């Protein structure tokens, strides 16, 4: 059976709700949201859920919202509230939701993140990393070389933080590669830099002019040979920050999410 036609609770009966959402109150300030978000970007949780007065989910704050806020700033933004920058689009699913329905919902929202009710009366997060967990246990003959080739977005050694952040928003990507290398900068790296000195929020224009190459770039894993998609999913699931380079093309968890829709991704056994 195709994994895309299976209900999430049947694929992951034990771990589907294993990543409780990290929430932040709607009246919390931007600096609090940044400090809370940094440890969770690219994990099972990945984003913050903005909670209302009765702890009901109102919206989401991820790397995209922080970057958009800084790019649009006209001065001191340190006192902007969480509900002033959050995305109001929040996808709620259940255990009966099929994998195909989940990924198609993410394709519509442009965000690989949903919330699902859990057994303790709250919500758990379902992100792209959960799909990596699903795909590593699938059976397939589909190879990495068969993934659709996409344009690799790059930046130059003298690019500023603002230029790279604009590239991210324009191209709807969370990672940008340093041209001619396997080094990259991500929304997480940029937000980590802000968290080291929250005074940047009082002068975002100055932050946008900083050379991004000094932010501490990370290395995409270079894949030396062609693998099956389930093998790559297993490798990426084990990576702290999953990002792979294969024959000059980058592969992110989102590419694995799209591959999960293939008729060749089957239930194991």
Where in this protein do the model-derived segments appear?
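Tandem CBS (Bateman) regulatory domains
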Residues: 1-19, 62-91, 101-109, 119-153, ...
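Conserved glycine-centered beta-strand/turn positions repeated across beta-sheet architectures
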Residues: 56-59, 114, 122-124, 180-184, ...
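The conserved cystathionine-beta-synthase
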Residues: 22-45, 52, 92-111, 117-118, ...
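Hydrophobic, helix-prone linear segments
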Residues: 1-61, 65
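Basic side chains
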Residues: 174-175, 188
């Amino acid at each position: 059976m195709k994994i895309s036609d299976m209900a999430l609770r049947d694929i992951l009966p034990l771990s589907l709700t294993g990543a409780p959402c990290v929430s932040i109150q709607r009246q919390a300030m931007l600096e609090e949201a940044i400090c809370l978000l940094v440890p969770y970007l690219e994990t099972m949780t990945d984003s913050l859920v903005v909670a209302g007065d009765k702890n009901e989910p109102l919206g989401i704050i991820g790397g995209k919202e922080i970057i958009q806020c800084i790019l649009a700033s006209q001065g001191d933004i340190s006192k902007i509230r969480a509900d002033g920058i959050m995305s109001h689009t929040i996808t709620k699913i259940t255990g009966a939701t099929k994998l195909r329905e989940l990924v198609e919902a993410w394709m519509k929202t442009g965000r690989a993140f949903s919330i699902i009710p859990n057994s303790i009366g709250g919500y758990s997060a379902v992100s792209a990393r959960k799909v990596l967990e699903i795909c590593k246990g699938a059976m397939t003959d589909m190879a990495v070389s068969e993934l659709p080739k996409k344009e690799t977005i790059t930046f130059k050694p003298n690019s500023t933080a603002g230029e790279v952040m604009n590239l991210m928003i324009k191209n709807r990507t969370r990672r940008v590669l340093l041209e001619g290398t396997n080094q990259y900068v991500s929304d997480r790296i940029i937000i980590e830099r802000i968290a080291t000195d929250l005074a940047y929020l009082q002068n975002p224009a100055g932050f946008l002019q900083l050379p991004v190459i000094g932010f501490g770039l990370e290395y995409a894993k270079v894949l030396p040979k062609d693998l099956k998609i389930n093998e790559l999913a297993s490798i990426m699931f084990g990576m702290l920050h999953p990002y792979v380079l294969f024959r000059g093309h980058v592969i992110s968890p989102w590419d694995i999410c799209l591959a999960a829709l293939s008729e060749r991704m089957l239930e194991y056994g």
